[in-house]
Structure formats: C-alpha cells, structure tokens
From Swiss-Prot:
Protein name, per record: Large ribosomal subunit protein bL19
Domain of life (superkingdom): Bacteria
Key words of the record: Ribonucleoprotein, Ribosomal protein
GO cellular component: cytosolic large ribosomal subunit
Family: Belongs to the bacterial ribosomal protein bL19 family.
Classification via SUPFAM superfamilies: Translation proteins SH3-like domain
UniProt keyword Ribosomal protein present: yes
GO molecular function terms noted in the UniProt entry: structural constituent of ribosome
InterPro entries per record: Ribosomal_bL19 (IPR001857), Ribosomal_bL19_CS (IPR018257), Ribosomal_bL19_sf (IPR038657), Translation_prot_SH3-like_sf (IPR008991)
General function of this protein: This protein is located at the 30S-50S ribosomal subunit interface and may play a role in the structure and function of the aminoacyl-tRNA binding site.
Pfam families: Ribosomal_L19
Amino acid sequence: MSKIIQQLEAEQMNREVPDFTPGDTVVVQVKVKEGNRERLQAFEGVVIAKRNRGLNSAFTVRKISHGEGVERVFQTYSPAVAEIQVKRRGSVRRAKLYYLRDLTGKAARIKEDIKRG
C-alpha cells in the first residue's frame, strides 16, 4: 500500500475505540437522522465477529429483540457510530461466534470473564 493511502487512513482513524473482543456485550450509540433532526440510537448486544482491517475495520453485534435475533454490522471508524461502550466482558474460545445463531434461551448465554473485568 502506498504511503499516501496509509497517511490518509491514519488521519481518518483518529477516534479512540475501546478494546473489545468477540463475546463482549457492547452498547453502540448510532447517529440516526430523522427529517431535519439527528438523535442517538443505542444498539446493545453481543459482539459475534470482529474484522480488523485498519480504516475498514468492522464488528458484528447480535441481540434478541421481541424474540427475534437481530444482527447489525458496524464500521468501527464510521462517523455514524458516535460511541462504543463495553458493558460486560465475555469469555469465549472462538473468534467468530456464528454458532450463537442456532442457540436459543439459556444455551446462548456467554460466561463472564472476571479476569478482564
């Protein structure tokens, strides 16, 4: 990759992102534009995947809403993402937790990681 592209990406990656891994429960504050006003919408769920590619980094958050599984992919350095807050650290042994899609109820719970607390 050329030096110019690396420099431009470094300038755009100025946001401080908290350290989180798959299995962690996060609250993502997303900027939503409704008409002429803008508000923040919270999306809370478990991180099931993380993609580290510099400026193109992304992570997938899964939550259960009214008995239906909802997944949303967020670009880590997107201007639409206002804030990422880690609520709970999870202890898992996989990098991609896609198997949670097939689990329901108590089986889909993730053990809390007390060491990283």
